[in-house]
């Protein structure tokens, strides 16, 4: 006997001014299509009077398409002044990973993607160096070398944006990509580009952060994953974590501990974004874990 295909799953996220009737309107539309809610999370920001919701649901096969659902939901969105996203949960986000010379975050992302822990579709790796090409090749992933110098920076960013368009990229991940992107590129990819910062923001920005941390005698080493904006390392924070250290750790040991934290923090941020669990709330985020 042939096992019937499972019903398609969708994820709906909404953000809007808070008022009565929002949940009723959303669930009412799903009921008209025999939708079954599999997971529902909501948050009411009382300080900003903003309402946030994430719903994962299924509908019977052949009953509706994601495009027609979006069209129907636009009526509700207009009524409640909502911003919303609706995705087929079985279609992974097309993802482009940017890296420079340090490959620990790239290695972690590719390993998790390869074993199915990250629901993304890695479409390629971009780098201003060749160091990580063998790693990408070991996973059968295209490696795009875009050298960056003061003279070629504009061309390199134009090449990056061309790849984003031609590969139909939804998510760009800066996995220790050590180039400052222009304001125009940051704005073009706003809300879909994640960076890992090698410190617990806002501390120790710039070069040699672990040497800065050592000189200050820190007791915690951390990392921050955030959306990229035109304000350097000031974008909305998705995830942070720390590990305890002490006077016995030299700068190299701090850096080794930091690499572990960076990899874990970035992978969590990418997973939550790929599962539509992160909603922007002004300069902050709401993360439905």
Each model region followed by its residue ranges:
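Short hydrophobic segments within beta-strands
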Residues: 15, 96-98, 126
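Short internal beta-strands
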Residues: 120-131
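Donor/substrate-binding cores of folate-linked one-carbon enzymes
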Residues: 129, 152, 156, 169-289
């Amino acid at each position: 006997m042939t096992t019937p295909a499972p019903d398609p799953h969708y994820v709906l996220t909404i953000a809007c001014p808070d008022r009565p009737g929002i949940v009723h309107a959303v669930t009412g539309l799903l009921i008209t299509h025999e939708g079954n809610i599999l997971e529902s999370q909501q948050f009411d920001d009382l300080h900003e009077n903003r309402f946030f919701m994430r719903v994962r649901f299924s509908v019977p096969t052949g009953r509706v398409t994601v495009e027609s659902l979006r069209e129907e939901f636009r009526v509700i969105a207009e009524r409640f002044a909502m911003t919303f996203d609706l995705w087929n949960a079985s279609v992974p986000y097309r993802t482009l990973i940017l890296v420079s010379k340090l490959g620990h975050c790239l290695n972690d992302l590719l390993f998790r993607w390869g074993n199915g822990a990250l629901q993304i579709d890695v479409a390629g790796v971009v780098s201003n160096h060749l160091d990580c090409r063998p790693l990408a090749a070991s996973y059968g992933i295209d490696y795009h070398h875009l050298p960056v110098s003061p003279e070629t920076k504009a061309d390199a960013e134009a090449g990056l944006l061309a790849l984003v368009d031609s590969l139909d990229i939804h998510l760009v991940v800066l996995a220790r990509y050590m180039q400052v992107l222009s304001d125009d590129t940051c704005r073009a990819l706003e809300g879909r580009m994640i960076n890992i910062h090698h410190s617990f923001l806002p501390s120790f920005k710039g070069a040699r952060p672990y040497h800065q941390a050592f000189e200050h005698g820190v007791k915690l080493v951390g990392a921050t994953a955030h959306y990229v904006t035109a304000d350097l390392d000031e974008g909305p924070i998705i995830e942070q974590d720390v590990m305890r250290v002490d006077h016995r750790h030299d700068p190299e040991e701090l850096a080794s501990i930091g690499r572990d934290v960076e990899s874990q923090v970035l992978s969590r941020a990418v997973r939550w974004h790929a599962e539509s669990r992160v909603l922007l709330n002004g300069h902050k985020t709401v993360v439905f874990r």
